[in-house]
Amino acid sequence: MDVTRLLLATLLVFLCFFTANSHLPPEEKLRDDRSLRSNSSVNLLDVPSVSIVALNKKSKQIGRKAAEKKRSSKKEASMKKVVRPRTPLSAPCVATRNSCKPPAPACCDPCASCQCRFFRSACSCRVLSLNC
């Protein structure tokens, strides 16, 4: 009985070791530069060379001025409000926070939209965007 338990324990340890070892990626042992060159997937001759060029003072100033122009144009664009053309109000319309089930007419507020919940059982006109 003890021999079978010892055999089963050894088998269990072997299976655990084999399972853990099979999930690890294989390690590559490179011995010298020749094996490194033969095993590498990227050929170093195919990569284009990179040249570093020093900038003079004039090009730095032009770059700084262009960056400042971009910053100022972005600030001006963000400060300007986009004016949306208002749709003419139709006579039969639904006020904000009132029920607006699909056969009902559109919402009176142009910034509001009909929002339904619970599988379109409860619908109401709501203003979604505060910037409108």
Curated annotation (Swiss-Prot):
The gene is ASIP. It comes from Homo sapiens. It is found in: Secreted. Involved in the regulation of melanogenesis. The binding of ASP to MC1R precludes alpha-MSH initiated signaling and thus blocks production of cAMP, leading to a down-regulation of eumelanogenesis (brown/black pigment) and thus increasing synthesis of pheomelanin (yellow/red pigment). In higher primates, agouti may affect the quality of hair pigmentation rather than its pattern of deposition. Could well play a role in neuroendocrine aspects of melanocortin action. May have some functional role in regulating the lipid metabolism with adipocytes. Glycans are attached at residue 39. It is linked to Obesity and hypopigmentation: An autosomal dominant disorder characterized by early-onset obesity, overgrowth, hyperinsulinemia, and hypopigmentation of the skin. Some affected individuals experience hyperphagia and exhibit reduced energy expenditure. Pfam families: Agouti. Residues 1-22 form the signal peptide. Disulfide bonds join 93-108, 100-114, 107-125, 111-132, 116-123. The keyword Glycoprotein applies. This is Agouti-signaling protein.
